[in-house]
Amino acid sequence: GATPHEGRKLAILSSRGLESGYWALAGYPILWSSNYSAVTSTFEELAQHGTWSFGLMHELGHVFNLGNSSWNWNDEMFANFRMQYGLEQNQGKVWMDERVYTGREILDMYKKDYDNTVYTQVNDNGIHYMLGRLAGPGGIGWEPFKAAFRELTTTGGAPSGKYDKFEYLLSLLSKHATRLTGRDVDVKTQYFTEADLASIRKQLQ
């Protein structure tokens, strides 16, 4: 529920001053590289498909990384997780992999990585999928995530290891889901398989 930059309107400025390889950089304002065709091709995509820009939405996700961030083991992943929330709440559209994803459909993109990597060493997109599916039908919904992130960003308390941070997040999700639903929720045992957890441990060790 926090608002970045004291609620001021966020500008997106095209710039030739970005280092080579950067598509855009989060901040106030967001800087968008005009060294290549990113700006032109993005506006062509918006006109053709009625989409928002995946890349700019990703940078907006970084902008909403507020407060204590000691719990956050990978903000590239969590920037996309915040983007998923924004797309779902507004039925926003993005163009990726030669198709349009609307709202929660974006999770289908991350499921591909989950399916391809979970039985070896799941990648960050696969972890995003496992967390993202929790917020959908049959899961715990978004409210426990909001409460957990609010607690993490205001009070801290997360351990130092990446996998330990992951488990700590699950424990907070369990606590808040139990409080909000009135039923006993253990996210780790009820929504993750042993294969899921072993694969995540390999990635985050």
Cite the ranges covered by each PLM segment.
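Non-catalytic terminal regions of proteins
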Residues: 196-205
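Surface-exposed patches in mature extracellular/periplasmic domains of secreted proteins
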Residues: 1-14, 70-72, 94-98, 143-151, ...
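Loop/turn elements at helix/coil->beta-strand transitions in domains of secreted/extracellular proteins
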Residues: 1-10, 59-62, 87-91, 138-145, ...
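Juxtacatalytic substrate-recognition/specificity segment
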Residues: 1-57
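Zinc-dependent metallopeptidase catalytic helix centered on the HExxH motif
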Residues: 41-104
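A residue-identity detector for tryptophan
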Residues: 23, 32, 52, 71-73, ...
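Short, Lys/Arg-enriched charge-dense amphipathic segments
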Residues: 22-42, 91-101, 116-121, 173, ...
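Active-site-proximal alpha-helical
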Residues: 104-197
